[in-house]
Amino acid sequence: MPHYTAPQPVVHLAELVLELMGDADLNEVMAMEEASHAHPWTRGNFLDSIAAGHWSYCMRAVDEIPKRIWAYCILLPAVDDLHLLNITVNPSMRRQGVALRLMQAIESIASNMQIPRILLEVRPSNHAAINLYERVGFTHLATRKAYYPLESSSGQREDAMVMVKTLELPPKTYEH
């Protein structure tokens, strides 16, 4: 029987990097936001977050030209919490492990900055997101009543699950 070597994969998950989000990214970010959310953030929301100093990142493939945004996130650092305000994966990149990689990067940021907890809100109807968050160690902390608007114009609202992950931080090192 002949010996066959495995072919190189046609599709592979490239090396991904986080880069600071800037004004030049907003057209692509807005297209992703509007394609992904029933009630998307506005351009003003993103500009305000960047101006306020929220940690705003775009995830891109290192070797891709032109460099598309694969995902983005907006993080609000506080004393002992890193609040994940917005996380979105490019619709064409979903189901490829990008969200997992972004969550791992967010956890690494929190750990490097000695922030022991990551908080987020998620719609209870967003089963895919909840499954991901639970898979990476988030647990249900609380419920915010009537937090999200529903897709209809009825004025009804959906609760938010508040989820949290407490990190095992390395000991602080002090320089003398």
Regions found by a protein language model. Give the residues of each.
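Short amphipathic alpha-helical segments
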Residues: 87, 131, 145
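Acetyl-CoA-dependent GNAT
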Residues: 2-4, 11-12, 17-94, 100-109, ...
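Short Asp/Glu-rich motifs
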Residues: 52-53, 129, 152-153
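Conserved catalytic-core motifs of GNAT/GCN5-like acyltransferases
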Residues: 2, 119-121, 134, 139-162
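Conserved glycine-rich acetyl-CoA-binding loop
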Residues: 90-104, 112-113, 117-118, 124-131, ...
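Positions that flank functional sites
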Residues: 48, 125, 147-148
